[in-house]
Amino acid sequence: MSAPSTVTWSAANARRMERQFLRTPAAPGEAGPAEVVDAMLAAQAQVMSAAELSVGLRMDGATRQDVRAALWGEEPSLVKTYGPRGTIHFLPTAELPFWTAALSAMSSGPSPFKADDRLTPSQTEEIVSAIGEALDGVRLTIDELSEEVVARTGPWAGDLVLPAFQGMWPRWRSVMHLAGHRGVLCFAPNRGRKVTYTRPPVSDAPQLSPEEATERLVQRFLYAYGPAKPREFAKWAAAPDGWASGVFASLASAGRIEAVEMESAETVEMASAETEGAKSGGAGSAWVVAGDTEFPGEPVRGVRLLPYFDAYVIASHPRAKLFPGRAYERALAGGQAGNFPVLLVDGVVAGVWHQRRSGRRLTVTVEPLDALSAAQGRELAGQVERVGEVLEGVAELVVGRVTVGAHA
């Protein structure tokens, strides 16, 4: 490790991968599922099998059963709830007080719902309170929870006004993610094929102020994915750019974060069209935690497979460097990362892949964008075998065109 005067993309990328067990998976006893998720700064989990794979691939010898035990065991170390961007994530149970404080403090954008369908601030608080009361000590399906919420609030909460995948949802569901952010709702084990919800355990940890939680979240993000710019943090958090710029400026003034110079030829995407240049030290600057300026001297080498919505793919920038050349069009969905499982070669996206399951048999189709060397082909075969181990199946590698489109 060294502290360079100018940080290259390859050095920044190598540090990110190293810190979240992608360069070298955690050895047995080094880190469990909760520690791995903590290093990832949450694991997106709307596709359960993909989230299990994200975590399992970062741990040598782990399977999805290790992840499930961390979620649903007698003393769970992971919670499945609504996290960054209002999407479903795994979060470490021990860190839930921090996350609820940070997510509750975060500035949000405009409501996506029609004015007549929105909840007033008082209605929002009433529903969040009702959700917490209804889930205390029990596990409810969405229909059971809906009945409880409407009974505790009023018929207005059950009005079918929210567009859904098939039909309409009741008004109260517009704040389910907020209930998760407030720490009064999380997922529980399925009841058959039905999803259930419960209230997470109350922690004895001291409550963080909104300012403390926000500072810690920014520092955690920069430790995992820095150097980064305010708008990259804002994109990850689904928060307004202006709010993020203000937070970064405040932390910089307090000496909590510092600017480093990124190699100018590698920061085209990072150049800001906004008026943050003076705050960030120039178009080639990005931020790290104060004092965290050492980077690996060697670039990443090797082949990795990452599933849908992997945290590294979503949070790492600049996109044009992580998805170079044809990968930018093939492995992104309208510029959105995570919608395709990706093949990494030497730390950058070099293809896409898809797995189809039939019983214990897994057919893993990998589409490299360029021909792999013999050594890379052997590494790929090993990665496919590891995917099978994590998902408790027997995996077969097929190299060819992936015909499945982007995940919604």
What are these model-derived regions, one by one?
Residues 326, 331-408:
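Glycine-rich, small/acidic residue-mixed loop/short-helix segments
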Residues 90-96, 191-211, 281-297:
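Short, cationic-aromatic polyanion-contact patches
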Residues 201-263, 281-283:
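Acidic, glycine-rich loop-and-beta core segments that form the ion-binding/anion-interacting portion
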Residues 255-263, 281-328:
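Non-catalytic regulatory appendages
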